[in-house]
């Protein structure tokens, strides 16, 4: 959804010291708003020719580890809001990319309006907050949700972290679906630090060590 200037602004916020320019790894971002027309990978009748061409292009990247579509609705005109067939088709397309290229394929999607007010640490309750057809979750190997924490938790965490109150600083994250066994479905509290969400437990441990010295 972002154009090139906004992408660079966000990257500078995440990593202001420019160390990323010395990394041995590459990140490629395709800003859809900069193109002459939308990049539609799936329509109601199926995946598009552009979707197939994209996979061929991705094959030219050596040692590819991650492909991310953000957000889903920017790449499809299929009715993923209510059609389980459309949701399953998207899941199959992502699975095909992973199988052919040996990489992880992530899709970023929004929660429904209720997800903004759900105050529960139950991961199965959080699962119902994912917008659209249930197959969007069911067709994936795993699904994570993130939503703002409640006001009381946010106030407490900001105080503990010694920062001014910021309603957007505290997020509840849950693993709500996984095809693997022996996974942790408990909801985790994350704190936004320097533009990056970090597990609160790790920050608390760091603060404890700092206070001791």
Regions found by a protein language model. Give the residues of each.
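Compositionally biased, intrinsically disordered low-complexity regions enriched in proline and serine
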Residues: 29, 94, 186, 209-211
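DNA transaction DNA-binding modules
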Residues: 196-213
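Low-complexity, intrinsically disordered short peptide segments enriched in small/polar/basic residues
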Residues: 3-4, 167, 206
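Short, surface-exposed, polar/charged, turn-prone segments marking secondary-structure boundaries
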Residues: 22-27, 95-97, 134-137, 201-206
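Phosphate-binding/switch region of NTP-binding enzymes
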Residues: 13, 66, 85-196
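Residue-identity detector for glutamine
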Residues: 35, 49-52, 59, 73, ...
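Conserved inter-motif catalytic segment of the P-loop NTP-binding fold
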Residues: 1-80
